[in-house]
């Protein structure tokens, strides 16, 4: 069972690439839109509501200054996969580091390709 958190509803097209693959793999998912910068309490509420569940992987989707991935990883005991959307290669080169560089005790796995992100979830769950 997987939770997907987008920083904004504008990330929906990128999220759909992931959820379409998860559907192919028959992996149940739930989607939320909440910005770590603008709605940190909403993100914490999502994490709190799921803390007693099992078999959760968070996929975080946030571009530009991606605080969401680190915020989720730092405040949850479940794995976090950051799959940031990029408009083009220049955008990726400028913004990828906000997903890659995390403080200690904040493990974020980064997968740039949405299909590979879903495949990583499938393999982690062993399905």
Can you describe what each PLM-predicted range is?
Residues 6-13, 17, 30-32, 91-127:
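C-terminal binding/interaction regions
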Residues 30-42:
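Short beta->alpha junction loops
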Residues 45-84:
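Glycine-rich phosphate-binding loop
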Residues 5-6, 60-62, 82-84, 109-113:
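Short beta-strand segments
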Residues 15-16, 41-45, 69-73, 93-94, ...:
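Short, well-ordered secondary-structure micro-motifs
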Residues 1:
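Conserved small/polar residues in nucleotide/adenosyl-binding loops
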Residues 68-106:
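Long, charge-patterned amphipathic alpha-helical coiled-coil/hairpin "stalk" segments used as oligomerization
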Residues 19-29:
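Short helix-loop-beta junction
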């Amino acid at each position: 069972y997987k939770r997907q958190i987008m920083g904004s509803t504008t990330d929906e097209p990128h999220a759909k690439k992931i959820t379409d693959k998860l559907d192919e793999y028959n992996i149940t998912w739930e989607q939320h839109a909440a910005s770590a910068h603008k709605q940190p309490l909403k993100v914490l509420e999502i994490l709190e509501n799921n803390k007693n569940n099992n078999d959760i992987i968070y996929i975080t989707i946030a571009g530009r200054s991606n605080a969401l991935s680190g915020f989720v990883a730092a405040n949850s005991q479940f794995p976090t996969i950051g799959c940031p959307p990029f408009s083009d290669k220049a955008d990726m080169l400028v913004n990828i580091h906000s997903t890659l560089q995390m403080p200690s005790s904040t493990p974020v796995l980064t997968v740039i390709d949405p299909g590979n992100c879903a495949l990583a979830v499938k393999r982690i769950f062993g399905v």
